[in-house]
Amino acid sequence: MSMKISEKKFNDRVGDGIQDSFMRGAVSSAQTRLYTNRLKAADELGNWEEWRELGEEIRQHTLENLDYYLMQLSENVSKRGGHVYFAKTKEEAAKYIQDVAKKKQAKKVVKSKSMVTEEISMNHALEEIGCEVLESDLGEYILQVDNDPPSHIIAPALHKNRTQIRDVFKEKLGYENSDDPYEMTKFVRKQLREKFMDAEIGVTGCNFAVANTGSLCLVTNEGNADLVMSIPKTQIAVMGMERMVPTMEELDVLVGLLCRSAVGQKLTSYVTVAGPIQEEEVDGPEEFHLVVVDNGRSQILGSEFRQVLQCIRCAACVNVCPVYRHVGGHSYGSIYSGPIGAVLTPLLGGYDDYKELPYASSLCGACTEACPVKIPLHDLLLKHRQVIVEQEGRAPLAEKLAMKMFSMGASSAALYKMGSKMAPAAMSPFTSGNRVSKGVGPLKNWTDIREFPAPSKERFRDWYKDHKKGGDK
């Protein structure tokens, strides 16, 4: 899989999402639960806004000094016996991982959940050279078996219910029991354990990399990442270049923010800090590789969108977004969905494929309020729209013509006067009472769901002319 998960046009994807009543119900229920849990976990601290400000300061400081911390991380990983590779592009990252697999003559690879490995199409790259790649995260495993893309950053199989999952297992894996979650989990555990023991390479993502220790932090609910790191002889960790913290002290703050914002817990079930195996350690890989992926991030870092790199992938913004609630994750056409996806995806994938995403927002600001590191997401969405129109020249033709006509009319007193006089008569076939009941052309999309006032028969200039200052007519 790559970052792009669908070849359908944006409007078609949205249409599919709106028609999927189960998906919308599942998303609504999950959003409500995760939102409520997040508020409770935040309230336990008593000073949530101060924690958010501290998180923002840590992320901004790290990004401002990213070159220094990346170099420090590289030096410390190397001192501990690991190998570090800086990949400028997703192709370079995938090629390096391929080369490691070829060198090890690996045929079986097991991996934990990782967005950046999806971004660089790692699974496809390994399959090209004959490797079998197994997802060990339960949600990702379900989707892999069903050849279905993820719909949520932290809950990738959110759009499926347990009956659908049972049917997938029955059809693809020969599962014969009920749709009881315990029974299905027990079945998957048996499937995965056998694969774990045979895998030559384990691949993980990285929630945070600690610069001054050369270690990585992984946060999971299932413990699968721990097995990926400890059983295979070779481990490859893949991280976006921005996923840095200076020391363990900053890590402590960000992990607390991440867990509370993502699932409403003080800590998730497993928080692991590890790296290359040391002499006194029993468990761990004999060989460790860290792949640091740029893939456009350095360009973002030097742009007006740099604040998006503060993201810690908690999905709090996704869990409060009213647009996501109604259209679902697949509508975004990217592994990154919701408000963060609408900002990040066009930067990584370009406007050619993702120019509609910045408009997939009501600009209500709920995402900005929910973000634990205070990314101004709705402002960045507006900035995208500005770039699309002013720099990219990608505004739809109808919008360009409408704006040009409005500009001509509004800048000419004679045209404006004539237009305001003719408007009531011109719009009368489309009005009912004092409201426009059916719009013309693109306006139909507005009037179908919103009330639009009809032009007044008495213009303000006429009313003003007929009234004396401070008196009546």
From Swiss-Prot:
Disulfide cysteine pairs (residue numbers): none
Gene Ontology MF annotations: 4 iron, 4 sulfur cluster binding; metal ion binding
Residues binding [4Fe-4S] cluster 1, per UniProt: C311, C314, C317, C371
Residues that coordinate or bind [4Fe-4S] cluster 2: C321, C364, C367
Assigned keywords, A-Z: 4Fe-4S, Electron transport, Iron, Iron-sulfur, Metal-binding, Repeat, Transport
UniProt domain 4Fe-4S ferredoxin-type: residue ranges: 302-332, 351-380
InterPro entries xrefs: 4Fe4S_Fe-S-bd, 4Fe4S_Fe_S_CS, FTHF_cligase-like_sf, Helical_ferredxn, LUD_dom, LutB, LutB/LldF, LutB_C
One Gene Ontology biological process: lactate metabolic process
Protein task: Is involved in L-lactate degradation and allows cells to grow with lactate as the sole carbon source. Has probably a role as an electron transporter during oxidation of L-lactate.
The family this protein is said to belong to: Belongs to the LutB/YkgF family.
Protein name: Lactate utilization protein B
Species this chain originates from: Bacillus anthracis
